[in-house]
Amino acid sequence: MAKEDVIEMQGTVLDTLPNTMFRVELENGHVVTAHISGKMRKNYIRILTGDKVTVEMTPYDLSKGRIVFRAR
């Protein structure tokens, strides 16, 4: 997938699911299921309920995403 095809949105973590999956509410009100990106997993960045995150989504499936950044 080319980097230009990615949609980046801000959101808030609502719930923690098994296998490092999270339910994230985006700024526009949609709720998506997201997993942690590889670099965040490698650097042991913890994500908790209520954290503000940046989610990357592909235009082909807008119900799933990848968490690429956790705001402080």
Curated annotation (Swiss-Prot):
Task: Report the principal subcellular site.
Answer: cytoplasm
- Domain named S1-like: which ranges? 1-72
Task: Quote the SUPFAM superfamilies the UniProt record gives.
Answer: Nucleic acid-binding proteins
What PROSITE patterns does the entry give?
A: S1_IF1_TYPE
The record's listing under InterPro entries reads: NA-bd_OB-fold, RNA-binding_domain_S1_IF1, S1_domain, TIF_IF1
Q: Which UniProt keywords apply?
A: Cytoplasm, Initiation factor, Protein biosynthesis, RNA-binding, rRNA-binding
Matching entries from SMART domains are given as: S1
Question: Could you tell me which Gene3D superfamilies the record lists for this protein?
Answer: Nucleic acid-binding proteins (2.40.50.140)
The subcellular location is: Cytoplasm
Q: Which domain of life is it from?
A: Bacteria
Task: Give one GO term, molecular function aspect.
Answer: ribosome binding
Q: Would you tell me the Gene Ontology cellular component terms?
A: cytosol
Q: Supply the NCBIfam families for this chain.
A: infA
Q: What does this protein do?
A: One of the essential components for the initiation of protein synthesis. Stabilizes the binding of IF-2 and IF-3 on the 30S subunit to which N-formylmethionyl-tRNA(fMet) subsequently binds. Helps modulate mRNA selection, yielding the 30S pre-initiation complex (PIC). Upon addition of the 50S ribosomal subunit IF-1, IF-2 and IF-3 are released leaving the mature 70S translation initiation complex.
Question: Which family would the database say this protein is a member of?
Answer: Belongs to the IF-1 family.
Subunit architecture: Component of the 30S ribosomal translation pre-initiation complex which assembles on the 30S ribosome in the order IF-2 and IF-3, IF-1 and N-formylmethionyl-tRNA(fMet); mRNA recruitment can occur at any time during PIC assembly.
User: What is the protein named?
Assistant: Translation initiation factor IF-1
- Originating organism: Vibrio cholerae serotype O1 (strain ATCC 39315 / El Tor Inaba N16961)
* Originating gene: infA
